[in-house]
């Protein structure tokens, strides 16, 4: 999860239906996978972080980028579950999963909503995974795909326990994040290269389990009951999205 976001679920059996929101691919070992890919994730959120970085610079008290991200992300944890009736659409480009043909980043709030910094950034972080939830709900509700745990990876998870908790809340399942979560796609390609050279006849899954991820430090968070009401607000507003 970074500039874009996607989820890949290895399936026990083929999907019963066809859905434009779902891509059916395979693992390198040939196992069937349902993939939900969304074009937009953290770019709009990053733009807002940059705005507050500029403000800190103007105030004469500049804040280093990692510290600024941590400050704003952790503050989002103190926001209301419904983000004070603040809703963010982070579509810098079209988002087919949500039916949006063109990018139109926007935010909305009700006149009587509780608009503050914590709720704004909670809504911004929710927006990074809202379109993903639309596709995942198809798998959960129409295909009865069950998931015990999802492993989160990407820059969105660099600040420990924030996006991870919101994703667990939104998808209704446990989310684990490894120590290497902040590494990008180049790291994954390096693992495949290492497997090609050092696989020793093992399957890719066996190699990863025995050579790469064994003993890897990770944390797992469970969904909280009322944790993602803001994501529900975004879904209620779906017809509005389709009018972009």
Please tell me what each predicted stretch does.
Residues 9-238, 243:
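Glycine/Thr-rich phosphate-binding loops that ligate phosphate moieties of nucleotide
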Residues 1-9:
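Phosphate-binding/catalytic loop of phosphoryl-transfer enzymes
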């Amino acid at each position: 999860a970074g500039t874009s976001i996607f989820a890949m679920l290895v399936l026990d059996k083929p999907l019963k239906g066809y859905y434009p929101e779902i891509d059916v691919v395979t693992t390198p070992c040939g196992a069937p996978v349902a993939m939900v890919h969304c074009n937009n994730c953290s770019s709009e959120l990053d733009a807002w972080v940059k705005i507050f970085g500029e403000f800190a610079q103007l105030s004469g008290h500049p804040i280093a980028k990692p510290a600024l991200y941590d400050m704003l992300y952790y503050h989002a944890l103190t926001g209301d579950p419904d983000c004070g009736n603040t809703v963010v659409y982070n579509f810098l480009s079209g988002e087919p999963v949500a039916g949006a043909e063109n990018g139109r980043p926007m935010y909305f709030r009700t006149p009587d909503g509780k608009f503050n910094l914590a709720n704004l950034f909670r809504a911004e972080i929710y927006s990074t995974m809202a379109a993903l939830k639309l596709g995942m709900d198809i798998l959960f509700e129409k295909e009865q795909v069950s998931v015990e745990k999802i492993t989160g990876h990407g820059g969105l998870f660099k600040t420990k326990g924030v996006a991870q908790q919101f994703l667990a809340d939104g998808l209704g399942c446990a989310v684990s994040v490894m120590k290497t979560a902040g590494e990008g796609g180049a790291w994954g390609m390096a693992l495949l290269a290492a497997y090609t050279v050092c696989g020793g006849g093992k399957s890719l899954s066996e190699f990863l389990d025995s050579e790469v991820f064994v003993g890897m430090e990770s944390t797992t968070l469970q969904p909280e009951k009322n944790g993602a009401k803001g994501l529900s607000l975004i879904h209620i507003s779906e017809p509005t999205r389709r009018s972009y």
